[in-house]
């Protein structure tokens, strides 16, 4: 199933998110399982499967990273999030210092200035990666996109770790 076709969108990475949402709601109205409650079991099963497919497609296309991986898949590239970073050692070595900064933050009881600085660095890297991915998709440089996705995954992960560690710290002091 091609999710771009399902939602009547052009098959390109950058999508009209408003149109995606509009078409999602139209499909949900047409294929919502509650509308077929009096139909046969086989029809209900088909409708339920279609509804699941619609929801999965919507979640895939709505999320930047999932859409990127899906679009690569449509273009013949199999991408597994779990192993991407392992293939980008140079990048890991270069940016592992962000984890050291996170450790320093924890040791300094999440100094507000240092925390804001690290958050800004990470957010700028995430924005840069997303713009670079969009650009490389336009140029159909899929192998470069894969490399940048691994970098984006790293920055997203450290952002999540920072948030989690900061929340743990806040619970401890309260």
Swiss-Prot record:
Interacts with HscA and stimulates its ATPase activity. Interacts with IscU. PANTHER family: IRON-SULFUR CLUSTER CO-CHAPERONE PROTEIN HSCB. The keyword Acetylation does not apply. Residues 2-74 form the J domain. GO terms for biological process: [2Fe-2S] cluster assembly; protein complex oligomerization; protein folding. GO terms for molecular function: ATPase activator activity; protein-folding chaperone binding. Gene3D superfamilies: DnaJ domain, HscB, C-terminal domain. It holds the Pfam family HSCB_C. The gene is hscB. Co-chaperone involved in the maturation of iron-sulfur cluster-containing proteins. Seems to help targeting proteins to be folded toward HscA. It comes from Buchnera aphidicola subsp. Acyrthosiphon pisum (strain 5A). SMART domains: DnaJ (SM00271). Keywords: Chaperone. InterPro entries: DnaJ_domain, HscB, HscB_C_sf, HscB_oligo_C, J_dom_sf. This is Co-chaperone protein HscB. It comes from the Bacteria. Belongs to the HscB family.
């Amino acid at each position: 199933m091609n999710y771009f076709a399902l939602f009547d969108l052009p098959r390109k990475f950058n999508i009209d998110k408003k149109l995606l949402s509009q078409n999602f709601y139209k499909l949900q109205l047409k294929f919502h399982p509650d509308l077929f409650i009096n139909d046969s079991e086989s029809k209900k099963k088909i409708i339920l499967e279609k509804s699941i497919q619609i929801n999965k497609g919507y979640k895939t296309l709505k999320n930047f990273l999932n859409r990127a991986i899906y679009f690569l898949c449509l273009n013949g590239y199999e991408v597994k999030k779990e192993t991407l970073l392992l293939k980008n050692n140079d990048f890991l070595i270069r940016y592992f210092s962000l984890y050291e900064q996170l450790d320093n933050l924890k040791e300094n009881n999440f100094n507000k200035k240092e925390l804001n600085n690290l958050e800004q660095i990470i957010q700028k890297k995430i924005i840069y990666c997303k713009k670079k991915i969009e650009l490389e998709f336009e140029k159909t440089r899929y192998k470069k996109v894969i490399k940048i996705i691994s970098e984006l995954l790293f920055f997203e992960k450290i952002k999540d770790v920072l948030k989690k560690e900061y929340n743990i710290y806040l619970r401890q002091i309260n």
